[in-house]
Regions:
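Glycine-rich, acidic/polar active-site loops that bind/position phosphate-bearing ligands
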Residues: 62-72, 124, 128-131, 135-136
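Membrane-proximal, solvent-exposed terminal domains/tails of membrane-associated proteins
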Residues: 88-89, 99-102, 106-125, 132-260
Length: 260
């Protein structure tokens, strides 16, 4: 028999508290046969089939056997409470090596490309000048109190710019009247489409902003970056891009964004 959204979600939420990793509950609507995540589905939806899922790996490592056991217990409780049959996609014995494989993938391809923009010696950057330069470069202030260059097709951030401070965030006060001791542009390589092109665009923005502000592109130790270093990073990104595709996971895909 079909199950209401609230009935399924109530059982799921009662037992999901034992889990640390990201998990989700999806259902197939009746009528309509559309798969929706119950957490965001309309309250009056009714579902014929349910899928409970758990993320098995990410950049922090693989799921443990005890976590998988708790996940199995959650699905058993749901099956019993909702009086529904149950089928696992794989056993714990099959899931553990698959989780390790995904974890190794995350470790192998976890790459953050970072470029620092430093001010002239003994000086800082004027907040209002930074805001104007970034606006002209097409970057917008947004998530996590940082600037982002958004993809107009997807609305997702292609790369970001942070304050060169411990927190990394920027405040409206700093941008309106403050001084900044440096800027950091960064790109989470596996999570964007066409990472090589995106890094090239990041370098273009970094050069533009640096020129506008009278700054210089530097490494984390404040040494001036040479062309050879950009080439080295670009080569590393191209290699990662092709390796990910050989692995069967495209950079910027939904699967890549879940893992990274």
């Amino acid at each position: 028999a079909p199950v209401s959204r609230d009935a399924a979600l109530a059982v799921f939420r009662e037992y999901e508290i034992d889990l640390q990793r990201p998990r989700a509950l999806h259902g197939c609507t009746q009528p309509g046969n559309a798969w929706l995540e119950l957490a965001t589905a309309p309250a009056d939806e009714v579902f014929s089939d349910l899928i409970v899922s758990l993320q098995m790996a990410d950049r922090d490592g693989a799921v443990t056997e005890s976590e998988l056991t708790r996940f199995n217990n959650l699905t058993y409780y749901m099956s019993e409470s909702l009086n529904r049959s149950l089928q696992f996609d794989m056993t714990i014995e099959e899931a553990l090596p698959e989780a390790e494989r995904l974890s190794r993938f995350c470790q192998e391809f976890d790459l953050l490309a970072v470029i620092h923009v430093g001010p002239p010696p003994g000086k800082g950057f004027s907040g209002p000048e930074v805001a104007r330069a970034l606006d002209r470069a097409g970057m917008r202030f947004g998530k996590d109190d940082m600037f982002h260059l958004y993809d107009p097709r997807t609305g997702k951030s292609r790369f970001s710019l942070a304050n060169r401070s411990e927190a990394g965030t920027l405040s409206y006060d700093e941008l309106e009247s403050g001084m900044l001791r440096g800027l950091v542009l960064f790109l989470n390589v596996p999570t964007v489409h066409r990472p090589s092109q995106t890094f090239s665009d990041l370098i273009s923005v970094a050069n533009y902003v640096s020129t506008e502000l009278g700054g210089v592109l530097v490494d984390p130790d404040k040494g001036k970056l040479a062309e050879a270093q950009f080439d080295s990073i670009s080569k590393q990104i191209r290699s990662l891009e092709s390796s990910m595709k050989r692995y069967g996971i495209d950079p910027g895909s939904e699967e890549a964004n879940r893992l990274f």
